[in-house]
Each structure stands twice: as C-alpha cells, then as structure tokens.
Amino acid sequence: MNDLLRFSGAVRRDPDVDAWFDADDGLRAIARPWFEQMRGCGDDVRELMADGAPTACVGDAPFGYVNAFSAHVNVGFFYGAMLDDPAGLLEGAGKRMRHVKLRWGRPINDAALSELIAAAYRDIGVRLGEVARQGGPKTLL
C-alpha cells in the first residue's frame, strides 16, 4: 500500500484554485461546495491545480479533486476504488481512481457524497501512516 501519488507545490490556499472557481462557468459553481468540503476536512489539507483541476491533498498526497466539463462535474477520488460506497455513487474502472458525476437538474445524494469525501480524507491519512511505518514513500510521480 505504499505506492502513493505525490504532487509537489501544494499549499494551504492556492490562488490558482480560487481563480479556477472564479471563472464564468456555471458548472464550476456546482463543484465549489464539494471542494470546500475537501478544504474543510482538516488543518493538514493543502491544494493545487493538477491536470487543470483543483486538487486536495494531505501534505503532498492527493485524496480528491473536482473538475467541470461541458455537461457535468466530476468529484473525484485518487484512491476511490478502495472506498466503501454503499450508495453506489462512484464510477470508473481504473485501478485506483473513481469519480462521482454531477449533472444539472439531477438530484445529488449530499450525505453519501459528503461521506465519500470524509472517507477519502481518512483513507489518505491511513495510507500516509502506512508509508511512514514502511520507511518512506515509493512515489508514482
């Protein structure tokens, strides 16, 4: 479990993330409260823009992101494949990453998505602790 993706340059509050949300794009407004939840997970949360998307990290290890597309918003999780998802919100087929798609006019299971965000934050904390116990990270980036 020590293969952790790492991003350098994460900071407490990244002005590039704020600029992304300030752009004139209605779908970004849908993404904002979910990223705010990620920001609020703990004092150790940092952020940066990664691949054009606001990304939340603990230290340099990402746990979540949001992104806006032409018809939907993704709320994504870097280790989402390992998260418990009793509401069945997560989509994707990759080895690790999963996302929840949000669309205009479709209901959102706020409680379940909030729990996924909290679970992703807790999960990255466990992963970071596991890395420390194993003598340091083997990074993927």
Predicted regions and their residues:
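Charge-dense, helix-prone N-terminal extensions
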Residues: M1-L141
